Amino acid sequence: MKKVFMISIGLFLIGCKGSQERSIVINAPINEVWAVFSDLGGHEHFTALDSASLSPSGEVAKGATWYVTQGKNFGKSEVTVVEPMKKIETKLIETSWPVTKWSETHTYSGDSESTEVSWKVDFTGKGVGNLFFPFFNAYLGSDIKKSLKNLKKIIEG
């Protein structure tokens, strides 16, 4: 019993690391998919987010700030990598969610017929959130999958 208690305390203090990645093929040229998915300020249209914005607004650029909200929670990330038609990476700056680290990688590959989009999130839990870590990890994977299906529906019509 003492061992279980010590392990629980350790996880609570250190944090749990997780990673979720999902992909989908969208029947549209890569430039059409890029135009929608790279618009980080428009992610509220196909995700569970209540709002999303990019500063400065417009085309995504390295150094831009991506601000999202969901309910009472918010997240503020910096865009760290932009390779047009290939990749976008972001890294968490500040959040009210129970995580200490959060980074996203969106990758694109395709041609004039179809595009594969991959969405990967790496994160580390914080505090009480670690107690629910397995559930949050599973939920995140499901949420990414649902968001990609919504994206596909929006683009394919």
Placement of each model-derived feature along the sequence:
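Sec-dependent N-terminal signal peptides
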Residues: 4-13
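Hydrophobic ligand-binding cavity/cleft-lining segments
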Residues: 14-55, 153
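Hydrophobic/aromatic beta-strand elements that line small-molecule binding cavities or substrate pockets
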Residues: 22-24, 75-81, 102-110
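Stable alpha-helical elements in mature extracytoplasmic
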Residues: 29, 36, 88, 140, ...
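Hydrophobic pocket/interface hotspot
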Residues: 32-37, 43, 66, 79, ...
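Sec-exported extracytoplasmic/periplasmic mature domains
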Residues: 38-42, 84, 145, 149-156
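Short beta-edge strand/loop motif at the mouth of beta-sheet-based domains
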Residues: 41-74, 85-87
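Beta-strand/loop substructures that line and gate deep hydrophobic ligand-binding cavities in soluble
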Residues: 93-142, 146, 151-153
